[in-house]
């Protein structure tokens, strides 16, 4: 939790974020991801200063448990002084003890954001899905929280001006915006209408631009002229290698590989789930991602 300190910006964790999206689809399946098409509604996690602190926190926790479809999980929320925003004991259940930073006693509107992250820890724990190392596992948790419909709360908790700053989670604001945009493109929603933080709008716009760049990489037909020109040059070079292929290439997401005695093939990440797709190099090709079922128009 950045509280008054510097806030990191940009996309320093993008590789892990993309791996997290792929891992979600692999562990949950396309059909399960689709059940999260509706995001947490602002009214369901609203918390005003006149609400009872403990009753309100329990109400918000129950709503997030319902959203993540953990009907037999019960969260017991308490507050104490700590350096982190929150903590959850990942026991066998069904009761899970969540501690929130004392700061939330007076910053109640962000309690939903903190609880969204902690309830996702419980969800991933039950799934048996984790990444090695605290940093990568927290990035997975932030990404899953956002992609499955509650992470807009975390981005909305980001506020920064010349005198102060606040940010929850391990992702940068722009990375939260990127995952939100990925979700928005899949489910055709506009999370920006829920933001109360002006800085959240800016971060979301930058994340959306990065997400759209994923959809404009060769060999996708939406690629721009510069990308298409680089792709054509790399393809010629790979074909000149006497069917040994060029393998991975620096600075681009695609790679050319031989296919025995058959045509050269190109692999590239699906812009939706980041799973790599491999298709023959033979002009216009329509590919379907086997993981997220996205249909892609390609010019190989």
Give the positions of each predicted feature.
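Pan-zinc metallopeptidase signature
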Residues: 1-15, 19, 167-300
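Hydrophobic (often cysteine-bearing) scaffold residues that line and stabilize catalytic clefts
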Residues: 53, 57, 112, 137, ...
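Short pre-active-site segment immediately N-terminal to the catalytic Zn-binding motif
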Residues: 96-115, 133-136
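N-terminal alpha-helical scaffold/docking segments in eukaryotic complex subunits
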Residues: 2-48, 132
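A structural motif
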Residues: 111-118, 151-156
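Post-HExxH zinc-binding segment in Zn-dependent metallohydrolases
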Residues: 134-169
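Auxiliary, metal-adjacent structural segments of Zn-dependent hydrolase domains
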Residues: 27-93, 104-108
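Active-site recognition of the HExxH zinc-binding catalytic motif
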Residues: 113-129, 146
């Amino acid at each position: 939790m950045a509280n008054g300190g510097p806030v990191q910006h940009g996309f320093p964790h993008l590789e892990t974020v993309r791996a997290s999206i792929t891992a979600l689809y692999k562990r949950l399946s396309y059909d399960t991801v689709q059940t999260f098409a509706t995001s947490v509604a602002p009214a369901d996690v609203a918390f005003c200063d006149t609400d009872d602190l403990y009753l309100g926190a329990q109400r918000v926790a129950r709503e997030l448990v319902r959203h993540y479809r953990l009907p037999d999980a019960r969260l017991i929320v308490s507050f104490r002084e700590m350096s982190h925003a929150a903590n959850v004991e990942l026991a066998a259940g069904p009761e899970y003890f969540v501690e929130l930073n004392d700061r939330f006693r007076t910053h109640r509107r962000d309690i939903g954001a903190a609880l969204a992250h902690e309830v996702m820890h419980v969800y991933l724990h039950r799934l048996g899905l984790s990444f090695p190392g605290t940093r990568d596992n927290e990035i997975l948790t932030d990404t899953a929280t956002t992609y499955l419909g509650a992470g807009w709360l975390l981005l909305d908790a980001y506020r920064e001006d010349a005198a102060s700053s606040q940010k929850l989670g391990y992702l940068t604001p722009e990375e939260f915006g990127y995952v939100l945009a990925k979700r928005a493109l899949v489910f055709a929603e506009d999370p920006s209408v829920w933001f109360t933080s002006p800085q959240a709008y800016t971060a979301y716009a930058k994340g959306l631009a990065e997400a759209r760049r994923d959809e404009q990489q060769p060999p996708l037909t939406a690629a721009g002229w510069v990308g298409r020109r680089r792709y054509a040059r790399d393809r010629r070079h790979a074909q000149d290698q006497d069917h040994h292929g060029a393998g991975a290439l620096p600075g681009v997401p695609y790679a050319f590989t031989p296919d025995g005695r058959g045509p050269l093939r190109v692999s590239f990440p699906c812009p939706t789930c980041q799973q790599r797709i491999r298709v023959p190099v033979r002009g216009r090709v329509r590919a379907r991602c086997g993981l997220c079922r996205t249909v892609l128009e390609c010019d190989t």
